[in-house]
UniProtKB/Swiss-Prot annotation:
Its EC number is 6.1.1.14. It is found in: Cytoplasm. GO terms for molecular function: arginine-tRNA ligase activity; ATP binding; glycine-tRNA ligase activity. This is Glycine--tRNA ligase beta subunit. Tetramer of two alpha and two beta subunits. GO terms for biological process: arginyl-tRNA aminoacylation; glycyl-tRNA aminoacylation. Belongs to the class-II aminoacyl-tRNA synthetase family. Keywords: Aminoacyl-tRNA synthetase, ATP-binding, Cytoplasm, Ligase, Nucleotide-binding, Protein biosynthesis. InterPro entries: DALR_anticod-bd (IPR008909), Gly-tRNA-synth_bsu (IPR015944), Gly-tRNA-synth_heterodimer (IPR006194). One of its GO terms (cellular component) is cytosol. It catalyses: tRNA(Gly) + glycine + ATP = glycyl-tRNA(Gly) + AMP + diphosphate.
Amino acid sequence: MSAKDFLVELGTEELPPKALNSLGEAFLSGIEKGLKAAGLSYAAARFYAAPRRLAVLVEQLAVQQPDRTVNLDGPPLQAAFDASGNPTQAALGFAKKCGVDLQQIDKSGPKLRFIQTIAGQPAAGLLPGIVEASLNELPIPKRMRWAARREEFVRPTQWLVMLFGDDVVECEILAQKAGRESRGHRFHNPDNVRISSPAAYLEDLRGAHVLADFAERRELIAKRVAELAAEQQGSAIVPPSLLDEVTALVEWPVPLVCSFEERFLEVPQEALITTMQDNQKYFCLLDANGKLLPRFITVANVESKAPENIVSGNEKVVRPRLTDAEFFFKQDKKQPLESFNERLRNVVFQAQLGTVFEKAQRVSGLAAYIAERIGGNAQNASRAGILSKCDLATEMVGEFPEMQGIAGYYYATHGGEAEDVALALNEQYMPRGAGAELPSTLTGAAVAVADKLDTLVGIFGIGMLPTGSKDPYALRRAALGVLRILIEKQLDLDLVAAVNAAVEQYGDKVKAAGLAEQVLDFVFDRLRARYEDEGVDVAVYQSVRALKPSSPLDFDQRVQAVQAFRQLPEAEALAAANKRVSNILAKSEDEVPPNVDASLLVEAAEKALGSAVANAESEVAPLAAARDYRAALARLAALREPVDTFFADVMVNVDDAAVRANRYALLAKLRGSFLGVADISLLG
């Protein structure tokens, strides 16, 4: 079957830059979905997206649908006709369903059958509907109307190109009649641009100063920004989201180096970077030591004959913003950091839980408690806790919310606070996302854990649990943050005790009954989710959770040991044996003796098992106490043979009550040795 290239380009006013790439991807996805539904084959398809256009190019698209055969089976012949040969309602109903007379139905087989070959339709007649459906399904939160038209789209449409091979696909979509006239760069080439063929689309527009390929523009910007940064003896900060946004703002990118006064470098560089990136869409430059250089890169959308005018204009625009940051920084430093707590006495953290200052007091107390137990400095943790929210009341954070914690660090350093105290003011918010950086200091870790536990306990304590996708206080992230800090920083904290301490600090503000257990269950459920994401079998998690270790670090060490144990050849048999032992002991009606009486071991197999368990117990106990759980389980794996022999040769429930009870005691010792690490009966 013959095939042609197909191109559709919808021209618009400037599209939302943050959504441009996703709109292009969705446009392509919708068209591919429509082509597949129509049975139209093609070789490849890709999208193009620029500020004023969305386009899709489909290579080697079939010019016509393939013919298809409809084959429908109807009722059996004996049900289709009565004894006189007259058609029944079943036969007539089947013919009606097929849309034909009964005479056109095949009666040669055991059932009525309708066979029809339907000729494929030309692709050119199907493409307008496919394109329109794709545009209607684009993920646009709010569509707009323009002029006196009823059509709706994300932005007013300006032109439409639809070519199938060399021919225009005649149609009208979103108030635009299809043609082959596109438009060039708004300033360099504002006239119409004739698209000679779908394959020539990119080059035709390139000649009109438009790079329609989003990926090409993105790569060009990234490369040129890196080159210019190197020329300035620096490196550029290029967040992927900023690069995407800048790519979506320009059709013909021209990166240029600009500068600002060095006096602004006295302001925290994070504030300068924030305002230049978020407000001006600039790429900031750092020196080899990670310090901000007094230069930045802007990406112009025009190749100017006087680029110095563009540079000068951007420098004038950024100066007031940097001046504002400088002013806020100087104003905030005029008073001690702790004095900002007075403002926080009137700022509500949560209506039922009190003010932000009260939260800082609780965090201070809990951070000191935690620091003592993880080897940190309780006094410094307490100090960091009481200062932890002060910067929320500063001018700097009021203008730049992203500076919370960071501003606190600079103001604490300016005020002569200990380095770990200052760092903790920023580290309290760590990790700021999945896989993000963790606190570098014990003081920071203590404050971060305290802050998150205080939020968890408080919000749970007033019954505002997260439901489904709703988690306004980010409790899931808080729980995962606590777990990451304690596990990845190797901090051995009794979380049960810490949560109870957090509950006590709230007093009568929360309903304390069962609160600690509720919070702990939530946190350890997050740990289960973390392991699932890492590919750990849920049975491994459950085998450890059954023992309810109170320290997340201890919990993780056990999980890693069980993971290793499962790889051993003895694991499956020992897991099954433990499950059998668990069932036997659960059904015991008699009290199980605490110790094994060697004189009551009668059979050779039980004597061998008794000796093996006793030897293993003496070796495993110190290993488990030292938390060398992997070595402990490896040692217990040697019990497989005597365990298998015991169950093969020995009957546990014998008539002799003393012997029976002694065998229960032996099995309890066996199970207890494994329970020092995990309940491996759950691995079956």
